[in-house]
Amino acid sequence: MRYSIDLSLVRKKILNSIQNTDSGHLGPSFSCTEILFVILKKYINFKDKNRNKIILSKGHAAPAIYAIFDYLKLLKKNELNTLRKFSSRLQGHPDKKKLKLLDFGTGALGQGLSVSIGYAHSSKLLNKKNFIFCILGDGELQEGQVWESAMYIGSNNIKNIITFIDGNKFQNEFSIKETLKEVNLRGKWESFGFKYIETDGHSTEKLEKIIKNIMSYKYKKPVVVYCNTIKGKGVSFMEGNNKYHSVKKLPLEQYNEALKELDGQK
């Protein structure tokens, strides 16, 4: 897989930042690492005032976006070690007032797609030809505001919003299936006027190809990309284990084993 060394490094940055601060959402940060990595590395140019935007609606995965900022050398030296510290720019959930690299502060789930609509309308008024990437969690889809936004986007055929769903099959306490019965997500999104694409959320090649097609307006309608992902991806004992949704400092043996496994992915 492309970027395997880079992704291993990013996941180690996530792990170390959470280990250092003794608190953070590890599993959901690991599950969306590839999605955020591809978008931030390939499609966000922070030097361009008319750049594409990224809204991390599942804001608890902030350690992932901070780690990628650090990988891209956008943070101050050693700033990643200040995660969740008092007065740090790197709060537990994204805070745009503190970190100007962010496009919006999130944390209360369900709001990101609405914010994306605002950005899309702003771009239209200012004649900007940019895209807005919005990353939702699959548990977040239980928020009604998501569907209000989806109906609006579909009804108005807003094609410069690209919606990603991090489908790691878990939420805070339970699996998605334990919380709700099976829902036909494809049918729901398509009924609102979206092109629904399902893919491997850990394949950077597939993600890049899909984004390239969307940005060329191949589908002539809004697109939602459901990414099949694994919570805790990259560390065997964390994968699919909701125990690692939100963690304190790992026991030293677990921490060392996690680092060993991540090093082995180079």
Each predicted region: which residue ranges?
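N-terminal capping segment at the start of a domain
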Residues: 7-23, 166-168
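Cofactor-binding active-site loop characterized by glycine-rich and histidine/acidic residues
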Residues: 14-17, 29-155, 181
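A short alpha/beta connector and helix-capping loop motif
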Residues: 143-168, 222-226
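Glycine-rich beta-alpha junction loops
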Residues: 34, 60-61, 168-169, 228-232
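Glycine/aspartate-rich loop-and-adjacent alpha/beta segment that forms the canonical ThDP
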Residues: 204-266
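Short acidic, glycine/serine/threonine-rich loops at helix termini
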Residues: 66-68, 95, 145-147, 173-177, ...
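Generic beta-sheet signal
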Residues: 52-54, 130-134, 161, 219-229
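Conserved thiamine diphosphate
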Residues: 128, 177-210
